[in-house]
């Protein structure tokens, strides 16, 4: 009788631990999905920096100052270059 009770309690404990671990893994996978756009944002930032720098260089060659309105979306024209604000 004691062995049966110990076996049942052990199985219940293992089941609870297994369910808890599964829930933690599911929560971690959801966090990872939310975190994915960070790498995409870095690529967008690099592209925007390149585009703004090129447009500022073109204006600079034409003996014009970099126009502040050229840089958009959190970028600002500074020292004839567009920089992230």
Curated annotation (Swiss-Prot):
It holds the Pfam family Toxin_20. PROSITE patterns: HWTX_2. GO terms for cellular component: extracellular region; host cell postsynaptic membrane. One of its GO terms (molecular function) is toxin activity. The keyword Disulfide bond applies. SUPFAM superfamilies: omega toxin-like (SSF57059). It comes from the Eukaryota. This is U4-theraphotoxin-Hhn1a.
